[in-house]
Amino acid sequence: IHFAHQTFNWSNEAKSNAAVYVVIIGFASFDITNKKIFEYENINEEPFEKEAKNINPYLVDSNDFFIEKRSKPLCNVTKMQTGSRANDQGKLLFSEDEKNEFIQKEPLSEKYFRQVMGAKEFINSIPRFALWLEDVNPSELRQMKYVLQIIEDIKKFRDKTPHLFGSIRNPKHNYLFIPQMSSQRREYIPIGFLNKSIIPLDPHFVIDKATLYDFGILTSKFHMVWVDYVCGRLKSDYRYSNSIVYNNYPFPKNVSEKQKKAVEEKAQNVLNIRSQFSDCSLADLYDPLSMPPNLKKAHQELDKAVDNCYGSKLFKNDKERIEFLFGLYEEY
């Protein structure tokens, strides 16, 4: 690759102007020494030119390599897995109104409802529930004709265990929830801790028994830069992946107890400030136009604590962070 324009927003003068995200790559079968990268601090602004020794497939001045799927994390960290999959054709999942209406006609079913969590529910504070029949009493089940009808409907296309979710992968402890999809407009992907009683839904991700340090690293600027360059997209929105993003992420090496404690304290501060806005959704809190100043400051302080875990170097911008991460990835 001789030169490259990193991602920018392209538009034309057509009446129905669609947003198109573009990269420009100039390459040949021979090498040159004077390579150039055109970087965009903002995808809607003009680029600035930077000389490069080598331009890799991620359009960064670094060695050539491809990040591929991994079944296990690159580093010694807790496994990230997907949540449970209903595979029920909409029979076992209920909105709050649907749940209340169902309980009115089937009162015995009330204790078998459990809250579930997908990205939409988590980010927008929308209650959603599942009819959870894993430990249902057979005698009670026979008394609930409307529940039996649901089971009969599911049995038509999934005969083996029609009263259960198709795939059950519920954490055994309180866990960290990571939505698969998040808007590219957000500076940070909203993630958070959930009680083990809440069922996480596939295709979203969980880390069972996660720590404040885990939360701090994954909600940091360093991790977001990795996400920005490595993860898949739907339109321009992030499409997170455990096998590509998390399992390949180069966590900081040789972190001291002092550094770790600093990350934990700053991470807790982010959670404390979020809890002050109990009437706001995460969509409200992480919209760049409405993000509270004290929450933004708390994230910036957390970013500094995580930066410090990656060494004493002062990282001026995200380009320096990603180049450092790619170098660390190769060391692992």
For each feature predicted by the language model, list its residue ranges.
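Acidic/histidine-rich catalytic neighborhood
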Residues: 18-20, 284-285
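Class I S-adenosyl-L-methionine-dependent methyltransferase catalytic core
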Residues: 11-19
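Polybasic, glycine- and aromatic-enriched phosphate-binding surface used to engage nucleic acids
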Residues: 33, 43-265, 269
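Adenylate-forming
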Residues: 6-11, 41
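Conserved beta strand-loop-helix elements of the APE1-like EEP
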Residues: 19-34
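Non-catalytic DNA-recognition/assembly elements of restriction-modification systems
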Residues: 145-154, 250-332
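Conserved Class I SAM-dependent methyltransferase catalytic core
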Residues: 1-6, 25
